[in-house]
Every structure is written in structure tokens, then in C-alpha cells.
Swiss-Prot record:
Cellular compartments annotated: Periplasm
Protein name: UPF0312 protein VVA0736
Lineage top rank: taxon: Bacteria
Family: Belongs to the UPF0312 family. Type 1 subfamily.
Statement: the UniProt record of this protein carries the keyword Signal: yes
SUPFAM superfamilies in the cross-refs: YceI-like
InterPro entries linked: Lipid/polyisoprenoid-bd_YceI, TTHA0802/YceI-like_sf, UPF0312/YceI
Gene Ontology CC terms: periplasmic space
Signal peptide: 1-22
Entry keyword set: Periplasm, Signal
HAMAP family: UPF0312 (MF_00780)
Length: 189
């Protein structure tokens, strides 16, 4: 009987959602389980979608103390990829993001607010094109748990809109902003 109670107790402890514990994670870019995507208007007629292929980062997450959560990301702006080599060369040029001069963009969170139902506001400082501005990312907790290889993972999605003029990036045509969509899966350190 005692063994049965202990076994049941251990099983219940293991069934408690993984995310209930505070943990530090590295963003899984090696396994391609994270992406930084963008969408920008093309002449007001359609949209160009793309991504940054090279980035790294980490985050801390505690479902019981959301305010203690933190995020740090570094993006190689030279890795911008819209699936069109000539356009990418132009976007990376001094006409837009000037990736030769400003080859990294960084985001460092300053505050994380719990909005309920797994939704979060992640506020922080984005440095892009040599300019640092506060932004807010509307994020959502996707899930957490053990992976098939014995590690622990946690995932989030997020969106934000960046006004190009805020970062001294020239506006061309009708689009004064770029929408960002973030998919983040972290592996527990």
C-alpha cells in the first residue's frame, strides 16, 4: 500500500505542468525550432514576407512569477532573406537597414506582464539600425514539456509592429512599418 501511495505521488508530481517551474532556456536555432519573420507592404498592392536566418538568444520563464521572466536576442541583420537575392541585397544596403554598418539587432526585455490565459506583454529595448527604442511584443505561451531526447522545452509565439522611422530606416513607397512574427522554442539549460 505504501509503495502504491509513493508511486502515485511521484506520478502526480511528474504530471504537474513543466512550465510551473522557473527555468532558463537557450533558443533552439540549431534545430530550426525558432524563427524571426517579417511582413512588409510592397507598393501597397501586396506583401513581402521574409525572415532572418541567423540569430541567437536565451530566456528565463517562470509561470508562477511571470514578472521575473527575461528575454535576450541577437539578430544578424546580414542574414535577412526574402527569397529574392537582388531584393535582399537592396534591403540590406544603406537604402534601408544598412546591414554592412549595423550588422546586429538586439532585443533585451525590461518587463514581462501577465495578460492572463497564457498571453504576455514582453516590453524591452530593440536596437536596430543603430537606434534603441522601447517596443512591446504581444506574446503567447504555446506549451512546455519533455522532448523525446530527455530535454525540457518551452515555446512561445509573438508579434509586434515596428515603425521604420523610429529606427531611422528610410521609408519607401506606402509602407511605414514592418510586422514581425516570432516563433520561439527554447531548450532548458
Amino acid at each position: 500500500m505504501r509503495k502504491s501511495v509513493i508511486a502515485t505521488g511521484l506520478a502526480l508530481m511528474m504530471a504537474v505542468p513543466f512550465a510551473a517551474n522557473a527555468a532558463d532556456y537557450v533558443i533552439d536555432t540549431k534545430g530550426a525550432h525558432a524563427s524571426i519573420n517579417f511582413k512588409v507592404s510592397h507598393l501597397g498592392y501586396s506583401f513581402i514576407k521574409g525572415r532572418f536566418n541567423t540569430f541567437s538568444g536565451d530566456f528565463s520563464y517562470d509561470q508562477n512569477n511571470i514578472a521575473a521572466s527575461k528575454v535576450n536576442v541577437v539578430v544578424d541583420t546580414r542574414s535577412l532573406d526574402s527569397n529574392h537575392a537582388e531584393r535582399d541585397k537592396h534591403i540590406r544596403s544603406g537604402d534601408f537597414i544598412d546591414a554592412g554598418k549595423f550588422n546586429t539587432a538586439t532585443f533585451t526585455s525590461t518587463k514581462v506582464m501577465d495578460k492572463g490565459d497564457g498571453k504576455l506583454d514582453v516590453m524591452g529595448d530593440l536596437t536596430l539600425h543603430g537606434v534603441t527604442k522601447p517596443i512591446t511584443i504581444a506574446a503567447e505561451f504555446v506549451g512546455a514539456g519533455q522532448d523525446p531526447w530527455g530535454g525540457q522545452r518551452a515555446g512561445f509565439i509573438g508579434t509586434t509592429r515596428l515603425e521604420l522611422a523610429d529606427f531611422n530606416i528610410p521609408v519607401m513607397g506606402t509602407s511605414s512599418y514592418v510586422d514581425m512574427e516570432l516563433h520561439v522554442e527554447g531548450i532548458k539549460k
